[in-house]
Amino acid sequence: MIDRYKHQQLRIGSVSPQQISAWTNKILPNGEIVGEVTKPYTFHYKTNKPEKDGLFCERIFGPIKSGICACGNYRVIGDEKEEPKFCEQCGVEFVDSRIRRYQMGYIKLACPVTHVWYLKRLPSYIANLLDKPLKQLEGLVYCDFSFARPIAKKPTFLRLRGSFEYEIQSWKYSIPLFLTTQGFDTFRNREISTGAGAIRELLADLDLRIILDYSSLEWKELGEEGPTGNEWEDRKVGRRKDFLVRRVELAKHFIRTNIEPEWMVLCLLPVLPPELRPIIQIDGGKLMSSDINELYRRVIYRNNTLTDLLTTSRSTPGELVMCQEKLVQEAVDTLLDNGIRGQPMRDGHNKVYKSFSDVIEGKEGRFRETMLGKRVDYSGRSVIVVGPSLSLHRCGLPREIAIELFQTFVIRGLIRQHLASNIGVAKSKIREKEPIVWGILQEVMRGHPILLNRAPTLHRLGIQAFQPILVEGRAICLHPLVRKGFNADFDGDQMAVHVPLSLEAQAEARLLMFSHMNLLSPAIGDPISVPTQDMLMGLYVLTSGNRRGICANRYNPFNCRNFQNEKIDANANKDKYIKEPFFCNSYDAIGAYRQKRINLESPLWLRWQLDQGLIASREAPIEGHFGSLGTYHEIYGHYLIVRNIKKKILSIYIRTTVGHIYLYREIEEAIQGFCQACSDGT
């Protein structure tokens, strides 16, 4: 439906029999009302045409071919001069055949039938509203027992005996056997109530506002009593309070949505449009039919049998009528939700029938597969892998996916640059993967963001915008810091790619949806792009070396290493000391690491511009060295000071590793970039 703000939305709920009748009934130009499906047939075996008043009737659901009736006559659709608007012989209107996708029919049930979703699904809505055990209501629905009608004025047979539910239950095999159909109907209408009709009467007598008042009052009284000290009684009171809360919420929902409780019992059963339950002809002339058609046929067969028992036959025992009502209830249950009451119904090949619930629920159901997860143009899907060299707002898009997503833009670029004369030539160049195609593709992608989505999209960070770049392979490369927002892992997860086409969508993607603009959780405001898993392990490896200072590394015999950071035998080199290398700047240290002269965690001395105020004055040097040029080296735990003869500081070296240098440079570049961005913004 469409609300007042012109937003399309879908709402599922109970409807009244009058609303079902308004949806399904239609008045033909001759005044005839059609819409009721009375025959369990589909197509005639000789003519292959839909049977009249059957499950595919053209009078009820519309013509199979646009503007052509069942007789074969043709009229122009929408031409007001064409008269009449329907075929007087077969009663089929001359309308578009697409009407068979939304025009419904109905089955008029011979007895009320309880909707199994409201009865058997947990929590049971009917049991909550009536405040009765579910097992007792099931016995009433499936005619296992009856209850006496509350007649105040007239003294009835059962009231004179003072009988109630469980006494009548013992009579359920005796009373119907001595009564015919007509006599049993008279007796039942006066004395007892059973089946879904009894549930309907109980629901119709409910006053939802009184339920709200009494339930709230009882909950308040239970809360004032407090704990009794008996664990069993306290649990019982707690369960009762939870039940009252559910009952109040359910009653409020019914009042708010203007739904009457008795609508949970069906008198008219809607029949889906034929295009949603098709019969398809395959090779060899065989027909494949939807399981729902077979379930509808079963309902119609049993309903017609019950109608005959109630109207035509006068000598049928009442027990047979009750049994047939139970069969109708079970047939409708199977149509709505096969297997909800136990063993599911199967066909001749021992295959379970797919009921209405199976068609709409789950990942392959109508909503998630066709409406929410349907395939759209300008979209793709692939596995995600980590791209540590990418920027936070970039993602790597495989060439195979990129050329398909941006094919129309590439074709326009080829034609504009006079590299192709028409669309066909441009597509040929794309199929042959000429080098010029990749150049134009990169130009197109440079100014066009893409959207990445990972299902299920539970919050707004489940879909974010990125600037794509071409990568080799068939997997989408993603920066590891954006993983948490998508709740994804690099263990085979897949993501969908979408291309925003309109200028409004592209502007929204750039201004609101880019990944570097969604660093905080929208729920609690905490940072969501934080290092985890592999990144933490990498940072640990970078900074794990040289953790215990110079003393532990130099004088521990198990830590003796050469200049290549290789372990040496401490006993064989007892008098040999390996000097740690000195570097004037970080570039020399990184160069030595790339030349494999040192390892990532090898300790080294790096010349550093360190403020003398940061040096602790009370710290005593571990040892001192005198150089040949008169310099004096004071060695501390994590730094070294070089002084001249006059005790003046010439330089300061810090003891570090290549991993620490890499981490420091990354942090320094990030801070400089942030400061530059702030200065550009001001």
Curated annotation (Swiss-Prot):
Signal peptide limits: none
Gene Ontology, cellular component aspect: chloroplast; DNA-directed RNA polymerase complex; mitochondrion
Cofactor binding, note field: Binds 1 Mg(2+) ion per subunit.
HAMAP family, sorted: RNApol_bact_RpoC1 (MF_01323)
SMART domains in the cross-refs: RPOLA_N
Keyword Oxidoreductase: no
InterPro entries, per database record: DNA-dir_RpoC_beta_prime, RNA_pol_asu, RNA_pol_N, RNA_pol_Rpb1_1, RNA_pol_Rpb1_3_sf, RNA_pol_Rpb1_clamp_domain, RNApol_RpoC1
Keyword list, A-Z: Chloroplast, DNA-directed RNA polymerase, Magnesium, Metal-binding, Nucleotidyltransferase, Plastid, Transcription, Transferase, Zinc
Residues that coordinate or bind Zn(2+): 69, 71, 87, 90
Originating organism: Populus alba
Compartments in which it is found: Plastid, Chloroplast
A GO biological process held by the record: DNA-templated transcription
Function: DNA-dependent RNA polymerase catalyzes the transcription of DNA into RNA using the four ribonucleoside triphosphates as substrates.
MF term (GO), any: magnesium ion binding
Ligand binding (Mg(2+)): 489, 491, 493
Enzyme Commission number(s) of this protein: 2.7.7.6
Summary of subunit composition and partner proteins: In plastids the minimal PEP RNA polymerase catalytic core is composed of four subunits: alpha, beta, beta', and beta''. When a (nuclear-encoded) sigma factor is associated with the core the holoenzyme is formed, which can initiate transcription.
Protein name: DNA-directed RNA polymerase subunit beta'
Upper taxonomic lineage: Eukaryota, Viridiplantae, Streptophyta, Embryophyta, Tracheophyta
Domain of life: Eukaryota
PANTHER family: DNA-DIRECTED RNA POLYMERASE, DNA-DIRECTED RNA POLYMERASE SUBUNIT BETA
